[in-house]
UniProtKB/Swiss-Prot annotation:
CDD domains: RecA. ATP binds at G65, P66, E67, S68, S69, G70, K71, T72. Its main location: cytoplasm. The lineage of its organism: Bacteria, Pseudomonadati, Pseudomonadota, Gammaproteobacteria, Vibrionales. PANTHER family: MITOCHONDRIAL DNA REPAIR PROTEIN RECA HOMOLOG-RELATED (PTHR45900:SF1), RECA (PTHR45900). Gene3D superfamilies: P-loop containing nucleotide triphosphate hydrolases (3.40.50.300). This is Protein RecA. Keywords: ATP-binding, Cytoplasm, DNA damage, DNA recombination, DNA repair, DNA-binding, Nucleotide-binding, SOS response.
Length: 347
C-alpha cells in the first residue's frame, strides 16, 4: 500500500473511531477477536463435540428437540455452570413451566437467578433486549420460542388467522439482539420445539417453529434426542440422550455427543468420564474391572462411576486430562506438528 493510501486509511479509521467509539473498527488479527469465551454445558462429551469447550459468549444458541428430550435440563445445567463461574443469568419462562425445585437439584442457585414470565412474545423479547443492553447479564435463556405468542394473537379470537406473525416478530428481534448481545458479551439460548411439515414425501419433514430467522442468526444449533432408557434393575432412572451439533460457527459442526440424563440429577458426568477415559486409554478396563493410574476403582461402570463421585479430586484430574487432550487445537499439539513436518519432508 502506498503512502497516500495509508494516510487516507488512517484518516478514515480515525474519523470512524471518533464518531462511533474506539474498537468500532479493527483488523481481524487485533485484540481478542479470534478468542471466543465459552461456558461449559455441564457435559464433557458435549463440550468436546462443540470443539471449543462449551457454548460461546456473545452469541445466539438454539436448542431444539421432541418433548421430554432434555432441552430445559440442558439449559439449566448451562446456567449452573455459568453461575459457578460468577456469571449473572436470567430465565425467560414463556411456557410458565419452570420448576425451581428441579432447577435447584441440578445445581442452579435460584436465589441469584433472574426469572420472568411474560404475557406476550413482544414483552418477552423486549425484556431480553433490555437485559442484553444493560451489560450486567451474561446468560439469558428463553423457554421456548413456540410459546412466544404475538400480542395480536392473544387479543384476537380463537379461530383468527395470524399468518407469519410470530416469524416476523422473531426476525425483527434477531436483527436488534445480535449486535447488543455481541457488545455486552451476553449469550442468549433459545429453546425450540419441533413441528412436522405437511406433504413432505422425501427428506426430513421436521422443522422448528418461528420461521427461518433464528436458524440464520444462531451461532450454534443443538438437536437433542432421547435414544433409550437408563435402568437400575427394572426401574427407569434416566434417559440415554444423543445431542447433535447441527450448526457451529466456532468449530467444526456435525459432531455428536452420547450422554445420560438421570432424573433429578442431570448429566451423568462420572459415567461420561469413565467412557471417555476408556476410549482415550486414560482408564484401563480389564473384563468388568476399571483401573485408573494402576489402582482399581470399581467392578462395572456403575461402581467405577460411584468411586468418581465419592472422590471428586480424581474426577477433576481425569476431566482436566481429557480436556487438554481433546480440546487443544491441532496446530498447538507438538506431536502433530512434528508428524506434518515429517510428511512434508517425504514429499
Amino acid at each position: 500500500m502506498d503512502d497516500n493510501k495509508k494516510k487516507a486509511l488512517a484518516a478514515a479509521l480515525g474519523q470512524i473511531e471518533k464518531q462511533f467509539g474506539k474498537g468500532s473498527i479493527m483488523k481481524l488479527g487485533d485484540n481478542r477477536t479470534m478468542d471466543v469465551e465459552t461456558v461449559s454445558t455441564g457435559s464433557l462429551s458435549l463440550d468436546i463435540a462443540l470443539g471449543a469447550g462449551g457454548l460461546p459468549m456473545g452469541r445466539i444458541v438454539e436448542i431444539y428437540g421432541p418433548e421430554s428430550s432434555g432441552k430445559t435440563t440442558l439449559t439449566l445445567e448451562v446456567i449452573a455452570q455459568a453461575q459457578k463461574a460468577g456469571k449473572t443469568c436470567a430465565f425467560i419462562d414463556a411456557e410458565h413451566a419452570l420448576d425451581p425445585i428441579y432447577a435447584q437439584k441440578l445445581g442452579v442457585d435460584i436465589d441469584q437467578l433472574l426469572c420472568s414470565q411474560p404475557d406476550t412474545g413482544e414483552q418477552a423479547l423486549e425484556i431480553v433486549d433490555a437485559l442484553a443492553r444493560s451489560g450486567a447479564v451474561d446468560l439469558i435463556v428463553v423457554d421456548s420460542v413456540a410459546a412466544l405468542t404475538p400480542k395480536a394473537e392473544i387479543e384476537g379470537e380463537m379461530g383468527d388467522s395470524h399468518m407469519g406473525l410470530q416469524a416476523r416478530m422473531l426476525s425483527q428481534a434477531m436483527r436488534k439482539l445480535t449486535g447488543n448481545l455481541k457488545q455486552s458479551n451476553c449469550m442468549c439460548i433459545f429453546i425450540n420445539q419441533i413441528r412436522m411439515k405437511i406433504g413432505v414425501m422425501f427428506g426430513n419433514p421436521e422443522t422448528t417453529t418461528g420461521g427461518n430467522a433464528l436458524k440464520f442468526y444462531a451461532s450454534v444449533r443443538l438437536d437433542i434426542r432421547r435414544t433409550g432408557a437408563v435402568k437400575d434393575g427394572d426401574e427407569v432412572v434416566g434417559n440415554e440422550t444423543r445431542i447433535k451439533v447441527v450448526k457451529n460457527k466456532i468449530a467444526a459442526p456435525f459432531k455428536q455427543a452420547e450422554t445420560q440424563i438421570l432424573y433429578g440429577k442431570g448429566f451423568n458426568r462420572e459415567g461420561e468420564l469413565i467412557d471417555l477415559g476408556v476410549k482415550h486409554k486414560l482408564v484401563d478396563k480389564a473384563g468388568a474391572w476399571y483401573s485408573y493410574n494402576g489402582d482399581k476403582i470399581g467392578q462395572g461402570k456403575a461402581n467405577a462411576s460411584k468411586f468418581m463421585r465419592e472422590n471428586p479430586e480424581i474426577g477433576a484430574e481425569l476431566d482436566k486430562k481429557l480436556r487438554e487432550m481433546l480440546l487443544t487445537p491441532t496446530e498447538d499439539k507438538p506431536e502433530v506438528v512434528e508428524k506434518i513436518e515429517e510428511e512434508n519432508e517425504e514429499f
